[in-house]
């Protein structure tokens, strides 16, 4: 699934339609926003990515220059990768684990410039770090 911030919202719509139609895959790969939003495909949480993006898009912690000035990141890491999925709009780790679909998050190795693929298996802390 493609990265690219708001392009990811298009991906969310496609994912939701595929889930509603019962379309499944043996595996999926997401990069950047595609990984962050695409993990909801494996956890089978239809509408979740769109829902929390709509709900928190005006919250400076979700993404803003104010967040960048305060934290050094455009997206407040604690808010986006811990508070939302753990408390505000809970990510279903059990469904993620139970789904046999293989899911990889891809990132760029800053030393070699090559793609590094991480197999996300349980939606726990290490997987979340790769998604961000």
Where are the predicted features?
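Patatin-like phospholipase
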Residues: 2-87, 117-132
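Preference for short coil/turn "hinge" residues that link or interrupt alpha-helices
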Residues: 16-18, 89, 103, 111
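Short, solvent-exposed coil/turn linker segments
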Residues: 63-64, 95, 113
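A short alpha-helix-loop-beta-strand transition element characteristic
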Residues: 88-102
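Glycine-rich, flexible loop/turn motifs
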Residues: 92, 114, 131
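Internal, conserved structured core segments that host functional sites
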Residues: 100-115, 121
């Amino acid at each position: 699934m493609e990265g690219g911030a708001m392009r990811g919202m298009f991906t969310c719509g496609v994912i939701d339609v595929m889930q509603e139609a019962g379309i499944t895959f043996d595996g999926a790969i997401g990069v950047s926003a595609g990984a962050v939003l695409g993990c909801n495909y494996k956890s089978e949480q239809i509408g979740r990515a769109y829902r929390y993006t709509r709900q928190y898009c005006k919250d400076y912690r979700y993404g803003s220059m104010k967040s960048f000035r305060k934290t050094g990141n455009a997206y407040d890491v604690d808010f986006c990768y811990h508070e939302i999925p753990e408390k505000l709009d809970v990510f279903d780790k059990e469904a993620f684990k139970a789904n046999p679909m293989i899911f990889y998050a891809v990132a760029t190795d800053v030393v070699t410039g090559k793609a590094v693929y991480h197999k996300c298996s349980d939606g726990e802390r290490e997987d979340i770090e790769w998604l961000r």
